[in-house]
Design a protein with these regions (language model features):
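Topology signature of small-to-medium multi-pass alpha-helical membrane proteins
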Residues: 2-173
């Protein structure tokens, strides 16, 4: 009986699966939060109505932040739909999904930096800043691992390999 040769372990697939978790976790959460903000712009449904005065620190607060409609739309676009698109690309095993995961992790950290400016210290903002960092880090790792696993050496491009024993040729992946 012949044994099947095991497929080599793919670090890209491991990082890709972790990135899928982060993009779905953040994307679905953002869509849920955005829908709730759009259904109840006062913020009462999520217990956020007391947070609205903190938005007065932002530019155009008297126009954009009288309720949570603009915040809901921004959350849906910036953190919701984008992360779900990244998850779809990661499911398709595309390198662009890993790049998007990294970028959207950084975007989440920037989003949370605005919250650090607006709100007093709180567990939720700090947690999501860490989640953004972890998403960016796993996205970056997936990009690196993808590049390493798809690195190709074509010796025909290096015609003089072995012709001069005094010359050292080094390949980098």
């Amino acid at each position: 009986m012949k044994k099947k040769k095991a497929a080599p372990h793919s670090r890209f697939n491991t990082a890709r699966k972790i990135s899928i978790f982060w993009t779905l976790f953040i994307g679905i959460g953002a869509v849920g939060g955005a829908v709730t903000m759009l259904v109840d712009p006062s913020g009462g449904l999520m217990g956020m109505d007391a947070m609205l005065p903190y938005f007065k620190k932002l530019p155009f607060a008297d126009v954009l932040f009288t309720d949570f409609v603009f915040s809901g739309i921004a959350l849906l676009i910036v953190n919701g739909i984008t992360n779900l698109i990244a998850a779809a690309l990661l499911f398709a095993k595309k390198k662009s999904g890993a790049v998007c995961s990294m970028i959207f992790g950084i975007t989440l950290m920037l989003w949370i930096c605005i919250q650090f400016y607006m709100f007093p210290f709180n567990f939720m903002s700090t947690s999501f800043f860490i989640f953004g960092f972890l998403q960016a880090a796993t996205g970056y790792a997936a990009v690196i691992f993808y590049n390493q696993e798809h690195f190709v050496i074509n010796e025909e491009n290096y015609k003089n390999i072995g012709s001069d024993p005094t010359r050292l040729v080094v390949f980098f992946s």
